[in-house]
């Protein structure tokens, strides 16, 4: 909670609130809006009418719990029932029944949906808001061309242009344009109405030729001219009903449907008063837009900034779910219409329940959550990742931009983003600037705009009122960027403050300020708000840090950060990872898997998460924090989850770090660590991998799960039970059988034994054999089996195969090749693990845990890590934890450095260690070489920063290939670890071998051992038995491929092979 002595209190909103509000909006409004749009359906002879009674719809509570839905791979959904009536018009009888329409996936307490047992989340999308936008561009002659673009609710565009002669055209396609008079006439206006409704009728009359008068003489002529230009049809088309329908479908529906947001924007921009329920583009809109375009041509009125947030709208979870619900109802309408016609044709008596099926709604939502680009699998690497994923904003997706076509201006930061979209947190790579993150206090307004809170300042009162403003409103106010805490120290009226006004950053007097920001974190996302001393870091490094915190692996023993920002508790609580008491009571008993709580005379069991796998293979586990007999209050923490301690986010460890070079082992961001981090399990994490296999019914018979697998060693089957499934608690190694499975197949005639052939010849018995298709543990999967699930979908047909899933837990210590990072973009790879006695040690004898490269600080300009490092050392010595808000220089100059030095001085004084703070080089200390015992030449910065272990681990990346699969066309090795691929020699390796002049080795690498089909088989044999490698006399596949590609370009390449024996030239075809 954020306080202000002059005003009301401001609380940071729930970090999942944007997801909850979207889903509630769909349930409250979107569902009924789409149901009301469902039409009355009649048969062809208009004897029967079917309709829905929307007022009585109901959603049933789910039959299963969230945890069971995940375990059994089901969808956590609610059944939708609506009353429907079937009316016979001849007898005026009505039959009313409650019908089941389908299942709607529900949102759980984390703001996610569970579909087929998988946590999925829907991302909010940023789209261009429907309306009209004016802009100016230079043509090839350097003359300004003014255009007005009307964007529809579907994303279609209609462009109005004005040429040098002040004639106005509407562009209907890339190459074709028509006069605005023809377009207005085709939409139903006559010439008199056009001239009465424009401000510049003389300009319209100036380009009205006799030919134009003929075209707009009647509505039919105008429609024919419009159709001819739009469809590029030659000759003289004839006016007909089908022609009008085609125009309506291909042009007007796509480009002229504004929607309620577009209608509001159109009215505001053109000063119109057309009713909000009229969401279609009218001739009056076209004429008003043309008038404004003429004014733009003569310098009247401002142009529009397409990248301003007031010209964008958020397509929220509610909009996406409502669109899918509407699509499902359209499909349902077609099904009902077809069923009614079929029943009448076969002279059957239909009922409402017989007409409606639940398939359209259920399949529509399943395909949406499974295939839509904005529906993503929830990233559950750690609690922070879960929260941040639901607050993403994407320009990508249907109706949006693509990473290839988006220009730099769209990706760049805009002044209207402040307080709404984080200027730091975005993706790296091709999607930079296209995927952003919502600022902490921002929310989605009623019209799809992003709103940010401000304090309104009154002249004669010290009270401040908080209000939320959309991007179009805060432009008219002077918004002070600083916080009032700095102003309270002196006389406010005499102070000058930085402010933002109309997309410019100014410095103005305090009495001119209208609004001020409510909190320094207001401009940042959650990831950026967790970086202490962020104001001392370069923005690029802050971006990397906010991304890398989401990649941190939960450790086996988590630890709170000494230096934080104060947001760690809310992130942990809103993530839903810790177990929280719903009401007060007394703890009866605690166990590893549940806590029993008594309250109001009832005993309530609270289940805990036990070794649950996330989709990034990290371990989600809860540990009880309360003891038996303790009285607790509502909202108190009962159990910590993965990466939380005491209800606070704990992603890493506070370790002793020195910034110094050490024998080149921290060259280029490499990190040297002590073996203490390995042996004391400081950075040990648990990972859970899932392996699954399915059993199908083949044409030869069903596949069998069994422990009797022929032709396999008993050692590989040692962990299987009598059913052929691995036993719980077994330790499995690479190559072990997890599930034994036999697939039936018919053997070839030649493979039958003589007695089998006799049986076939005499009795006609088909002897079947089985092929071993067991689930084997792949390379790098060794570990302990912690769970086995046998999942069988309802129905039991061959289309619903049985699935067996085996979960294996791995304990991973930190090792050479793992990636670690701080919270300031300082990342590195472990290069060497040194014995603790060889590590540099402090003056009190303690060896450091990590050695970082000091050259990683000045060029990267992330000095915040040095402040955190020194303050962490002071906090560990004083046993204190610090929570520091950013931009503390608003209190006084050098506030961060003064705080760090004062705490170091106090720690030095309290612990009687003068080396902690030495005035000659504050923050630095002389340390000693563990190998020699002598001091290093220069004093070194030492401290305790918060270091994270990231998901990029060497066990998942390291890969080697001795033999494997080849591509069929090129005969080159496949690419990637998952395909057991790997090109042995690349271009740069060839250069290196060329530099050494090793021609024979190079020839072997590029031909015999690579893509010569016959030679590579012989090479393998000679390598095993010993001997010389045979040299083939024909070309390798890569050369043959080159010849074929040249041949496809009509270039014939004749090649000759020179024999080494008699130097004869033998011509061979490729």
Curated annotation (Swiss-Prot):
Localization per Swiss-Prot or TrEMBL: Plastid, Chloroplast
Coiled coil: none
Cited InterPro entries: DNA-dir_RNA_pol_bsu_ext_1_sf, DNA-dir_RNA_pol_su2, DNA-dir_RNAP_su2_dom, DNA-dir_RNAP_su2_hyb_sf, RNA_pol_bsu_bac, RNA_pol_bsu_CS, RNA_pol_Rpb2_2, RNA_pol_Rpb2_2_sf
Catalysis: reaction(s): RNA(n) + a ribonucleoside 5'-triphosphate = RNA(n+1) + diphosphate
Catalytic activity, EC: 2.7.7.6
NCBIfam families recorded: PRK00405.1
HAMAP family per record: RNApol_bact_RpoB (MF_01321)
Protein's name in the database: DNA-directed RNA polymerase subunit beta
């Amino acid at each position: 909670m954020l306080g202000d002595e002059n005003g009301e209190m401001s609380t940071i909103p729930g970090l999942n609130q944007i997801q909850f509000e979207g889903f509630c909006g769909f349930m409250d409004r979107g569902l009924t809006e789409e149901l009301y749009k469902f039409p009355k359906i009649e048969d062809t002879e208009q004897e029967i009418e079917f309709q829905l009674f929307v007022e009585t719809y109901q959603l049933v509570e789910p039959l299963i719990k969230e945890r069971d839905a995940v375990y059994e791979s089901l969808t956590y959904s609610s059944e939708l029932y609506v009353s429907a009536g079937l009316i016979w018009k001849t007898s005026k009888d009505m039959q009313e029944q409650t019908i089941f329409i389908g299942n709607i996936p529900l949102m759980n307490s984390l703001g996610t949906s569970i579909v087929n047992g998988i946590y999925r989340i829907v991302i909010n999308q940023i789209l261009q808001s429907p309306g009209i936008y004016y802009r100016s561009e230079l043509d090839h002659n350097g003359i300004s061309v003014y255009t007005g673009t009307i964007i529809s609710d579907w994303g279609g565009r209609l462009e109005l242009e004005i040429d040098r002669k002040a004639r106005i055209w509407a562009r209907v396609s890339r190459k074709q344009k028509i006069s605005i008079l023809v377009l207005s006439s085709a939409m139903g206006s006559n010439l008199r109405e056009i001239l009465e409704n424009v401000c510049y009728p003389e300009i319209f009359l100036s380009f009205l030729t006799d030919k134009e008068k003929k075209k707009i003489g009647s509505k039919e002529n105008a429609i024919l001219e419009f159709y001819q230009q739009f469809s590029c049809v030659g000759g003289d088309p004839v006016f007909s009903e089908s022609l009008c329908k085609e125009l309506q479908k291909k042009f007007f529906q796509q480009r002229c449907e504004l929607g309620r947001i577009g209608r509001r924007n159109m009215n505001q921009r053109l000063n119109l008063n057309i009713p909000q329920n009229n969401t279609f583009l009218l001739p009056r809109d076209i004429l008003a837009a043309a008038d404004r375009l003429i004014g733009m041509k003569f310098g009247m009125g401002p142009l529009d900034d397409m990248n301003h947030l007031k010209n964008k709208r958020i397509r929220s979870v509610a909009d996406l779910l409502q669109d899918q619900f509407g699509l499902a109802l359209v499909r349902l309408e077609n099904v009902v219409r077809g069923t009614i016609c079929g029943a009448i044709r076969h002279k059957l008596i239909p009922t409402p329940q017989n007409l409606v099926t639940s398939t359209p709604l259920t399949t529509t939502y399943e395909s949406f959550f499974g295939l839509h680009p904005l529906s993503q699998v929830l990233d559950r690497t750690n609690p922070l990742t879960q929260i941040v994923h639901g607050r993403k904003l994407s320009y990508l997706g249907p109706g949006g931009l693509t990473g290839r076509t988006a220009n730099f201006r769209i990706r760049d930061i805009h002044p209207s983003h402040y307080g709404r979209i984080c200027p730091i947190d975005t993706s790296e790579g091709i999607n930079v600037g296209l995927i952003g993150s919502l600022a902490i206090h921002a929310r989605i307004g009623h019209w799809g705009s992003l709103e940010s809170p401000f304090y309104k300042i009154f002249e004669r009162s010290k009270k401040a009122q908080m209000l939320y403003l959309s991007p179009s409103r805060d432009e008219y106010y002077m918004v002070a960027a600083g916080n009032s805490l700095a102003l309270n120290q002196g006389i406010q009226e005499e102070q000058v403050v930085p402010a933002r006004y109309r997309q410019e950053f100014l410095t103005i007097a305090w009495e001119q300020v209208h609004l001020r920001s409510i909190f320094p974190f207001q401009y940042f996302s959650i990831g950026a708000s967790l970086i202490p001393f962020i104001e001392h870091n370069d923005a690029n490094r802050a971006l990397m840090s906010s991304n890398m915190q989401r990649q941190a692996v939960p450790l086996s023993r988590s630890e709170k950060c000494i230096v934080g920002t104060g947001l760690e508790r809310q992130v942990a609580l809103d993530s839903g990872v810790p177990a929280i008491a719903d009401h007060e009571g007394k703890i009866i008993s605690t166990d590893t898997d549940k806590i029993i709580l008594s309250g109001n005379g009832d005993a309530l069991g609270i289940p805990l998460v036990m070794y649950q796998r996330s989709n990034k293979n990290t371990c989600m586990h809860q540990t009880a924090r309360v003891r038996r007999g303790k009285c607790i209050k509502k909202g108190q923490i009962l159990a910590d989850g993965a990466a939380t301690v005491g209800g606070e986010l704990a992603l890493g460890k506070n370790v002793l770090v020195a910034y110094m070079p050490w024998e080149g082992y921290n060259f280029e961001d490499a990190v040297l660590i002590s073996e203490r981090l390995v042996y004391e399990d400081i950075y040990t994490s648990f990972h859970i991998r899932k392996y699954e296999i399915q059993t199908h019914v083949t044409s030869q018979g069903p596949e069998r799960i069994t422990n009797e697998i022929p032709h396999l060693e008993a050692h590989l089957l040692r962990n299987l039970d009598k059913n052929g499934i691995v036993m719980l608690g077994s330790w499995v190694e690479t190559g072990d059988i997890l599930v034994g499975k036999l697939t039936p197949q018919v053997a070839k005639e030649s493979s039958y034994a003589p007695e089998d052939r006799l049986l076939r010849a005499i009795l006609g018995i088909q002897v079947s054999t089985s092929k071993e298709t067991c689930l084997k543990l792949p390379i790098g999967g060794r570990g302990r089996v912690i769970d086995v699930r046998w999942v069988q979908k309802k129905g039991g047909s061959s289309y619903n195969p049985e699935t067996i899933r085996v979960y294996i837990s791995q304990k991973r210590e930190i090792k050479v090749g793992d990636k670690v990072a701080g919270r300031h973009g300082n990342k590195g790879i472990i290069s060497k693990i040194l014995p603790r006695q060889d590590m540099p040690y402090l003056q009190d004898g303690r060896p450091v845990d990590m050695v970082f490269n000091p050259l990683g600080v000045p060029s990267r300009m992330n000095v915040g890590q040095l402040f955190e490092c020194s303050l962490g050392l002071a906090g560990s010595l004083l046993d204190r934890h610090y929570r520091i808000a950013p931009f503390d220089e608003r209190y006084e100059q050098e506030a961060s450095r003064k705080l760090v030095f004062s705490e170091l001085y106090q720690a030095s004084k309290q612990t009687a260690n003068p080396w902690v703070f030495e005035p000659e080089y504050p923050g630095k200390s002389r340390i000693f070489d563990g190998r020699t015992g002598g001091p290093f030449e220069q004093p070194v910065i030492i401290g305790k920063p918060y270091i994270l272990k990231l998901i990029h681990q060497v066990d998942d990346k390291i890969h080697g290939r001795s033999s494997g699969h080849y591509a069929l066309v090129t005969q080159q090795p496949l690419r990637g670890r998952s395909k057991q691929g790997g090109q042995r020699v690349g271009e740069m390796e060839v250069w290196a071998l060329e530099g050494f002049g090793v021609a024979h080795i190079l020839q072997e690498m590029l031909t015999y051992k690579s893509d010569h089909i016959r030679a590579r088989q012989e090479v393998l044999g000679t390598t095993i038995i010993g001997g010389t490698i045979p040299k083939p006399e024909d070309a390798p596949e890569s050369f043959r491929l080159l010849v074929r590609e040249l041949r496809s370009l009509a270039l014939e390449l004749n090649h000759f092979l020179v024999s080494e024996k008699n130097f004869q030239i033998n011509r061979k075809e490729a």
